[in-house]
Each structure stands twice: as structure tokens, then as C-alpha cells.
Amino acid sequence: MRQAGAIAELIEALRCLPGVGPKTAQRMTLHLLQRDRDAAGRLSEALRQALEKVGLCAQCRTLTEHSLCEYCASPGRDRSLLCIVESPAEVLAISRSTGYKGLFFVLNGRLSPLDGIGPEELGLDVLEQRLKDDGVAELILATNTTVEGEATAHYLSDMARRHGVRTTRIAHGIPFGGELEYVDGATLSHAFDGRKDF
């Protein structure tokens, strides 16, 4: 049965979420409308509030309800360390899983000329100004290991070098608990090349 009107619009709207295809979107829609209208109202209100209140941090470009995020506003963070990530989700992952005490800069994407994403779309003019003026001693590149992520890392490394800022790249390789026989060749090669003293 083909849906029309408001139901079809809600199904299509839910498909914008990562990992949500047409069947999952339809199940979500029908659940919210049939069984949990209160939750649907709360979801609608929470989304409206977030859209109204949440924007980008003026300094690092992560999501925040204030002009500066909790990291940039904190006087206890090491301002000489600047970690570059592709998305706000990575800020949360690094903060939750590591002892990192420096600042972040969120690209909200990665260089991808074929998709029309260049340095301007990633706020690299803002980053370059920070490298010039903010006393950054080390730029930590934590972009993904995709082709675009690697190209972005090289571009940022060149930028940092022009300003005399040390650049490091987070290690990539074998996941903790992983077995070598199941690791792809490129990952194994990268891990082998990045070995360190033990």
C-alpha cells in the first residue's frame, strides 16, 4: 500500500537519518502515530528546540547552545594542542575515550573537490587564523582514513608547516582485540609501518 500526504512526508523525512531506509522509516512512522503519540510530540518539540538553540561554536565549530562550547570556554584546557576532527561526534568520542586535554577544531566534513567541498566550506580560513594567532604548538590530525580524509590531513599538514606548527597524526591500525588474519592488507601495512618501541 502506497502512503500519501502527511504519513508519506514523515516517512521521507525520517529517511534523512543515517542508516534509515524506507522500511525502517515506515516502521518508525507507524509506531509513533499508532502506539506512541506522546513520544512523537516530545520528539517533535525536542527537535524544534535543538534547531532553535544549537549552533556552531565560534572558535572550534562543534555543536553548542552557547557562543563557545564547553571545551573552548574551559580555562583548564591546554590551548597549545589543537585536534582536528571531521565531525562533532568525533569530539565526543575522543573526549570520552582518551585523556586528551587540548582543544578541538571541527571541519564538519572533509576536502572533496568532486562534491564541491573545498577549504572555504571547512572553515580553514578560521583554522589558519588560529594557527597564526593562538599559540598552537601541535596540530593533531584525527581525520578518517578515507581518501578524502587523507587528502585533508595532507592539506592541513602543509598549512601547519607554513606557520611553524608541529603536526602529528593519530595512529591507525589493528583494533584492540583484533586478530591479524582478519585485518585487511592496507590496515595491516599501515599498522606495521607505524610500529613503535615496546
UniProtKB/Swiss-Prot annotation:
- Show where the Toprim domain sits: 80-175
* SMART domains named among the record's database cross-references: TOPRIM
Q: Does the keyword Zinc apply?
A: yes
Which stretches of the protein fold into C4-type zinc fingers, per the record?
57-72
What molecular functions are annotated in GO for this chain? DNA binding; zinc ion binding
Q: Give the matching SUPFAM superfamilies.
A: Recombination protein RecR
Q: What does this protein do?
A: May play a role in DNA repair. It seems to be involved in an RecBC-independent recombinational process of DNA repair. It may act with RecF and RecO.
Q: What is this protein called?
A: Recombination protein RecR
